[in-house]
Amino acid sequence: MVGIDTGGKIPPEIMRQATEKTAQLAPLEGGHIYSILKQTLEKLALVGQLQVDPKVQAHELTQSVGEEISRMITEQKKLESRFEELVALQHVLRHQPNKTKLMENQVASERQALQLLLSNCLNEIEVFGKVQPLVESVMAQQAAEQAMKETIEREKNTTAAVRQLRNDLREEKLDHEEKMKEKKKGLSTLKEQLKALKMDTAVSTRYLSKDLTAGNEHERRLQRTQLEDLLKDLGLVQQQIDIEKAVHATQAEFLRQIAAKMADDSSNWASRHDGDLAAREKELEMLKQQHARDLIELKKAEEKFKMEQALKKEREMKATEERERAEFEEMRETRRAQAAVIIQAWWRGHKVRMVMSGGGKKGAKKGGAKKKK
């Protein structure tokens, strides 16, 4: 909707509409309206001239009020308190505009605008026989009122929206405060729980520290004891090594003596060879017989082992079988080792005797040849 602008000028759109709606007045109507508007202008001018000065009116009012001061003496105390309040607001009141003066100025400006409008209408009637300025003013005023209504409606809607937003904001604040209270309660509970956990952790840490300290001390004592035992074992091993060295030296000396004695006794091996060979063969035969008996005993032990194995549980069967097999292998290896040692000893002795016997025969043959010569 088009209205009057801030400078008091009528917009071109309203002027165009007023021109379209304004009709030509009849001479009689024009004269009648002209006389009415002229009288109105004269009365407005007279009102402007008869207007009383505000200062004079204020002076007269002051005189009339002075006559009533005696009646208000009894209310002096009340007025003094009010006066103190007014004195406190004096600085603010000084800076406020004079509402009466402002209203009078507004009336004067409206009167001048009306005079100008009526003058324009008179000129328009005299020239064109129309009241177009008056129509334009009325239409502009209606447009301004419509714009004002729309503005007021928008303001109401805006105010309602603001009120609703404020209510929503208030509810949101209340909801937020309620949530914050709940969160504070939860935070307080969590703080209490954290405090309890810290206390429990401190107690547990102290207990674990003492426990670890005691365990470490016990472990150090055990390690110290084990170290002392190992040192003792090391001393014993060192003594055994020294003893072994002494024994080895003694054995070496003994072997050297044996070698010397064997060198001295090598001449006697030829005569002793046959007897030793027979004795070794006899011992070998005895070993074979013993081996055969051992095989028979071994078979019996295996049969007995199988019979006992069937009567035991599966778990004990495996353990017993491994143990007896280990014992059997150890016994057999021992027997074999013993037999191998005996056979090797016999075989070495046999070879030595053969060597010695061969040397003796060669010596005997050489002696016989010499005798023949």
From Swiss-Prot:
Subcellular location: Cytoplasm, Cytoskeleton, Flagellum axoneme
Coiled-coil features, chain-numbered ranges: 145-200
Main location: cytoplasm
Cellular component terms per the entry's GO annotation: axoneme; motile cilium
Top-level taxon of origin: Eukaryota
Keywords associated with the record: Cell projection, Cilium, Coiled coil, Cytoplasm, Cytoskeleton, Flagellum
Residues annotated as domain IQ: 336-365
Subunit structure: Component of the nexin-dynein regulatory complex (N-DRC).
Family of this protein: Belongs to the DRC9 family.
Biological role stated in the UniProt entry: Component of the nexin-dynein regulatory complex (N-DRC), a key regulator of ciliary/flagellar motility which maintains the alignment and integrity of the distal axoneme and regulates microtubule sliding in motile axonemes.
Protein name: Dynein regulatory complex protein 9
Gene: DRC9
